[in-house]
Amino acid sequence: MPLAVGTRLGPYEILSPLGAGGMGEVYRARDTRLGRDVAVKVLPGHLMANAELRARFEREARAASSLNHPHICTLHDVGHEGDIAYLVMELVEGETLAERLTRGPLPASDVVKFGAQIADALDRAHRAGVIHRDLKPGNVMLTKAGAKLLDFGL
């Protein structure tokens, strides 16, 4: 069920929807403690109702939160508000690689640059024991600073 604008999840106030997929809905939200905008991913209820999936989610969230890399979206927080479980992540502005590819192929120089950035990010994650479970163009955000990996399948 979509969250209404103004809904509070702990210190995070929902501002607008950003997207939805099989693993939940993502919203732009305001961190009222730190005064910054963040992305909040609300997880489906069936995920949190299953104890094994909930434990896996919490393990993976802990592992992902340890990743510090310029080309990996930072996980800031996890929380529960009533029966709603959520992740709080860095808000990454830009367009996904999937969106960009609808306008045609990338120049070879961009393919090399973004490919190297994604490979470096994946190497860092793998060295930390974290596997990206949903690597696809829709989970690569292109920003002014380069490529950022999103959504490690949490």
Language-model segment annotations:
Residues M1-L154:
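Conserved ATP-binding/catalytic core of the eukaryotic-like protein kinase fold
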